[in-house]
A protein has these predicted regions:
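Short glycine-/Asp-/Thr-/Trp-enriched loop segments that recur within the blades
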Residues: 1-7, 59-67, 121-124, 251-256
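Beta-propeller domain segments
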Residues: 6-8, 16-18, 84-246, 254, ...
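Core-facing hydrophobic residues within beta-strands of well-ordered domains
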Residues: 8, 66, 128, 197, ...
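Asp-box/WD-like beta-propeller blade repeats and closely related beta-sheet repeat scaffolds
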Residues: 35-71
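Short coil turn/linker residues within repeat-based beta-strand modules
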Residues: 46-49, 107, 237-239, 292-294, ...
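Short, acidic, Ser/Thr-enriched surface-loop or helix-capping motifs
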Residues: 72, 104, 263, 335, ...
């Protein structure tokens, strides 16, 4: 690994983990100003990442390498790539820097990408370090501004986000002319001075109802460190605008690097990254959860039974078979982004459950069945 900004930047597990335990990783090699950024996929053998396959290699820089990864329901992969400190690259369609890239999971170029034969999905990005999939298929990103205008954006195929000609909203004469000529997409929110926005996740779990339909955003706090926090960005019902912001954990005096959500319990995991740039420690992850909601899982034990899904992927209907009679209980089905899709009762001595999936979006789903004998979980796919 190189010194300075280049490092291991992002990783993402494949949604169908139980059947295909693979991990995508973005990392840099070489020196700080003469290196490469690699997108690789590894197999997980239960103890280590093995069998690396490099899917994509692009030029890296001493700063602004990105990167975040997001697997979409159509089994494509988004990867953010920073401008590596050369802002002019962001508007060049032939460059992969200063972009959001989209790949098939095997590393090939999707046929429906905006530019034929190119990984480029969006242009005009400075350094996006957050990606999240929300309701209705909306993709959100967070992006570092230079000296002003950190951004929360909606990612749109073929979109131009303005950098370096536009920072934040189109609110100067020069920016307005460029925006009109290039159909620049303005952010949902922008922050001046910079607060150093970082990892984001969509939250819609019933464990914390007050946070449902919101973006959880990690905030490093800028070079001065006075703005560090976890921001809860409440969204309008359609997800296309922000209705308010709540701020948490500022009193910890810790830079908030990233955030993740447990799709089963609704727990929120927050990565703290020390008190100052570039990270003085302690570097820790803390779990925050509603213990009243999660208490049904505290003493649960995994059954010896396995839960099989057929057909997988499903179209209009899927049958879940755990092969042994269960006591009465309840089940919950979650989309990969944590949204509760369906819940219901399990009947005494039941061995199968049929779900009607015709109206569900294509993508990955989790099911958990909770009963007096314990908890059974599984993942499955829906494809139309």
């Amino acid at each position: 690994m190189a010194a300075a900004s280049p490092a291991c930047w992002a990783w993402r597990c494949i949604p169908d983990w139980e059947n295909t335990p693979k991990v995508f990783v973005v990392y840099c090699t070489g020196s700080a100003w003469n290196g490469d950024e690699h997108l690789s996929v590894f197999d997980w053998d239960g103890t280590a990442l093995v069998n690396e396959e490099i899917l994509l290699t692009i030029q890296a820089g001493g700063i602004h390498n990105g990167s975040r990864l997001l697997v979409l329901p159509d089994n494509t992969l988004l990867m953010t790539a920073g401008d590596i400190g050369s802002s002019s690259l962001a508007q060049l369609e032939g460059s992969l820097q200063g972009k959001t890239l989209r790949l098939n999971l095997d590393g090939s170029v999707p046929e429906d990408n905006p530019i034929d034969g190119s990984y480029v999905y969006t242009i005009g990005n400075r350094n996006s370090q957050g990606l999240a999939l929300g309701a209705n298929g909306i993709i959100y990103s967070s992006e570092h501004g230079q000296n002003s205008n950190d951004e929360l954006n909606i990612v749109t195929a073929g979109g131009n986000y303005g950098w370096p000609e536009v920072e934040g909203f189109c609110n100067t004469i020069g920016e307005q002319a460029f925006c009109a000529e290039n159909d620049v997409i303005e952010p949902l929110e922008a922050w001046t001075p910079c607060i150093a926005v970082n990892g984001i996740e969509y939250y819609n779990h019933e464990a914390i109802p007050e946070w449902q339909n919101s973006i959880l955003m990690a905030v490093l706090g800028g070079l001065g460190g006075q703005y560090e926090r976890l921001s809860v960005m409440h969204l309008a019902e359609d997800g296309l605008s922000v209705t308010g912001e709540e701020q948490f954990f500022s009193s910890f005096n810790q830079r908030v690097r990233d955030v993740a959500v447990n799709p089963y319990t609704g727990s929120v995991y927050v990565a703290f990254n020390g008190t100052s740039y570039p990270g003085s420690g302690p570097n820790i992850i803390k779990e925050f959860r509603n213990e009243a909601f999660a208490s049904s899982l505290d003493d649960a034990m995994q059954l010896g039974a396995t839960l099989n899904a057929f057909p997988n992927p499903a179209n209009d209907e899927i049958q879940l078979d755990w092969g042994m009679p269960l006591s009465a209980g309840a089940y919950e089905v979650y989309a990969y982004n944590g949204q509760l899709i369906e819940s219901g009762q399990l009947f005494e001595s039941s061995t199968i459950l049929k779900l009607q999936t015709a109206s569900w979006n294509a993508g990955s789903y989790f099911i958990r069945a909770i009963h007096s004998q314990g908890t059974v979980t599984a993942t499955f796919q829906v494809a139309h």
